[in-house]
Regions:
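Short, Lys/Arg-rich, polar N-terminal cytosolic tail immediately upstream
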Residues: 1-11
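Cytoplasmic juxtamembrane regions at transmembrane-helix boundaries
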Residues: 82-106
């Protein structure tokens, strides 16, 4: 099967989403580095659906948040840079290929922002209640 390589330019919304993602990654690392020395030895590491802490662990667990966020950001960015490797149906390599690639990359970019925002929110909530 022939893979069509298309590198479409970002529009303004794409650039804003990418900038927000990078900003959130930097915020998670900065806040974690700044707050780590003042954290208690035991911190909440799991929350109930009501937002109440129901699991506790060493303060070293706080490093998982920025690490996971960075890995997710890098992975989704790499995947998004190679839309031609996605498993599209055979009829996708026609006139609408570029449109499909744009839609797919926008979905992945939005997913990246959503996931990073959720992890960042959880980190900030954890730091707020400790």
């Amino acid at each position: 099967m022939v893979q069509t390589k298309i590198h479409s330019a970002h529009n303004q919304l794409d650039s804003i989403i990418e900038t927000l993602c990078w900003f959130l990654v930097l915020i998670t690392w900065s806040v974690t580095i700044i707050r780590y020395p003042t954290l208690p030895a035991i911190i909440p590491i799991h929350f109930s659906p009501l937002g109440e802490a129901d699991g506790f662990g060493s303060k070293a667990y706080i490093w998982l948040y920025p690490t996971v966020i960075t890995i997710l950001h890098a992975g989704l960015t790499i995947i998004n840079n190679y839309p031609h490797t996605f498993n599209l149906t055979d009829n996708s390599h026609t006139q609408n290929t570029e449109l499909q690639f744009k839609k797919i990359t926008k979905i992945i970019r939005t997913l990246k922002l959503t996931v990073i925002s959720l992890f960042t929110g959880t980190l900030l909530y954890t730091l707020l209640i400790t």
